[in-house]
């Protein structure tokens, strides 16, 4: 929980990254952690409408956009996004966010490939906040 990027935002970045890669296990855990670290119900319920939402600052919006682009294959971080990102974040903060995205790149692949069994508390958060929640792969 150290660094310049808030713990709340790092968890939302992890959630967005996990959603892009499709790992239900990590989605549930990151949305639960974002809630614990202070994300509002409105932010969590509408995280995919962040671009138009007043519940996210411009700084948070570009961070979530970065998470989507950096988590995509092929990578979609382009010059325009890089310029927008640097309006709000310095190199250290960008590296911190990319560290979260990279960590979840590993965790998403590991937990999804292994079908890691989801814990009851994480399942509750998934049902509460994630539209289309279906962790069947992680229930056995």
Regions found by a protein language model. Name each.
Residues 1-140:
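Hydrophobic alpha-helical segments
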């Amino acid at each position: 929980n150290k660094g310049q990027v808030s713990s709340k935002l790092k968890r939302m970045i992890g959630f967005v990254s996990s959603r892009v890669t499709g790992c239900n296990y990590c989605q549930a855990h990151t949305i639960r952690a974002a809630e614990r670290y202070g994300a509002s119900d409105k932010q969590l319920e509408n995280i995919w409408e962040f671009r138009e939402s007043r519940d996210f600052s411009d700084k948070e919006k570009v961070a979530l956009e970065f998470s989507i682009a950096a988590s995509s294959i092929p990578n979609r971080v382009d010059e325009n996004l890089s310029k927008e990102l640097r309006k709000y974040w310095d190199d250290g903060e960008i590296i911190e966010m990319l560290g979260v995205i990279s960590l979840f790149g590993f965790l998403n692949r590991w937990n999804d490939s292994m079908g890691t069994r989801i814990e009851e508390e994480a399942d509750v958060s998934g049902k509460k906040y994630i539209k289309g929640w279906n962790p069947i792969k992680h229930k056995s």
